Swiss-Prot record:
Homohexamer. Belongs to the Hfq family. This is RNA-binding protein Hfq. CDD domains: Hfq. The keyword Transferase does not apply. It comes from Shewanella sp. (strain W3-18-1). GO terms for molecular function: RNA binding.
Length: 90
Protein backbone atom coordinates (compact mmCIF):
# COMPACT_ATOMS: atom_id res chain seq x y z
CA UNK A 1 0.00 0.00 0.00
CA UNK A 2 1.25 3.49 -0.80
CA UNK A 3 2.77 5.53 2.00
CA UNK A 4 0.26 8.34 1.31
CA UNK A 5 -2.57 6.10 2.47
CA UNK A 6 -1.16 5.72 5.99
CA UNK A 7 -3.29 8.72 7.06
CA UNK A 8 -6.05 8.44 4.46
CA UNK A 9 -7.38 5.05 5.56
CA UNK A 10 -7.70 5.82 9.31
CA UNK A 11 -9.28 9.20 8.44
CA UNK A 12 -11.91 7.66 6.17
CA UNK A 13 -12.47 4.74 8.54
CA UNK A 14 -13.13 7.08 11.49
CA UNK A 15 -15.60 9.06 9.35
CA UNK A 16 -17.32 5.79 8.45
CA UNK A 17 -17.31 4.37 12.00
CA UNK A 18 -18.66 7.55 13.61
CA UNK A 19 -21.11 8.21 10.74
CA UNK A 20 -19.83 11.77 10.40
CA UNK A 21 -21.60 13.75 7.67
CA UNK A 22 -19.07 14.95 5.07
CA UNK A 23 -18.86 17.30 2.13
CA UNK A 24 -16.70 15.94 -0.67
CA UNK A 25 -15.47 18.46 -3.21
CA UNK A 26 -14.51 17.09 -6.61
CA UNK A 27 -11.71 18.46 -8.78
CA UNK A 28 -14.34 19.98 -11.10
CA UNK A 29 -15.85 21.97 -8.20
CA UNK A 30 -18.94 19.83 -7.58
CA UNK A 31 -19.87 19.36 -3.92
CA UNK A 32 -21.28 16.02 -2.76
CA UNK A 33 -22.69 15.46 0.72
CA UNK A 34 -23.43 12.33 2.72
CA UNK A 35 -21.80 9.76 4.97
CA UNK A 36 -18.92 7.45 4.10
CA UNK A 37 -20.52 4.03 3.84
CA UNK A 38 -17.36 2.20 2.74
CA UNK A 39 -14.16 2.74 0.79
CA UNK A 40 -11.29 0.92 -0.83
CA UNK A 41 -8.08 1.84 -2.60
CA UNK A 42 -9.88 3.52 -5.50
CA UNK A 43 -13.40 4.59 -4.48
CA UNK A 44 -15.54 5.95 -1.64
CA UNK A 45 -19.15 4.86 -1.34
CA UNK A 46 -21.06 7.96 -0.22
CA UNK A 47 -24.57 7.47 1.17
CA UNK A 48 -27.26 10.15 1.29
CA UNK A 49 -30.74 9.62 -0.15
CA UNK A 50 -28.94 7.36 -2.64
CA UNK A 51 -25.51 5.73 -2.63
CA UNK A 52 -22.87 7.15 -4.95
CA UNK A 53 -19.56 5.57 -5.87
CA UNK A 54 -16.99 8.37 -6.04
CA UNK A 55 -13.59 7.68 -7.56
CA UNK A 56 -10.80 8.99 -5.33
CA UNK A 57 -8.86 10.43 -8.27
CA UNK A 58 -11.79 12.84 -8.79
CA UNK A 59 -11.75 14.10 -5.17
CA UNK A 60 -10.12 17.36 -4.19
CA UNK A 61 -11.16 17.71 -0.53
CA UNK A 62 -13.08 15.82 2.16
CA UNK A 63 -14.60 18.11 4.82
CA UNK A 64 -16.20 16.61 7.95
CA UNK A 65 -19.33 18.43 9.18
CA UNK A 66 -18.31 18.02 12.83
CA UNK A 67 -15.24 17.14 14.89
CA UNK A 68 -14.41 13.44 15.22
CA UNK A 69 -11.68 11.29 16.73
CA UNK A 70 -9.15 9.96 14.23
CA UNK A 71 -6.15 10.09 16.59
CA UNK A 72 -4.50 7.60 18.85
CA UNK A 73 -4.32 4.61 16.54
CA UNK A 74 -1.24 3.40 14.74
CA UNK A 75 -2.28 1.80 11.50
CA UNK A 76 -0.69 -1.15 9.75
CA UNK A 77 1.62 1.12 7.73
CA UNK A 78 3.03 2.80 10.85
CA UNK A 79 1.15 6.10 10.62
CA UNK A 80 0.21 7.98 13.78
CA UNK A 81 -2.31 10.60 14.80
CA UNK A 82 -1.21 14.14 15.77
CA UNK A 83 -0.85 13.42 19.50
CA UNK A 84 1.78 10.82 18.62
CA UNK A 85 4.05 13.31 16.84
CA UNK A 86 7.71 13.15 17.76
CA UNK A 87 8.50 15.89 20.32
CA UNK A 88 10.26 18.91 18.84
CA UNK A 89 12.85 19.01 21.63
CA UNK A 90 11.08 21.53 23.84
Amino acid sequence: MAKGQSLQDPFLNALRRERVPVSIYLVNGIKLQGQVESFDQFVILLKNTVSQMVYKHAISTVVPARPFNVTGHQNAQGGYGPQDDVPSGE
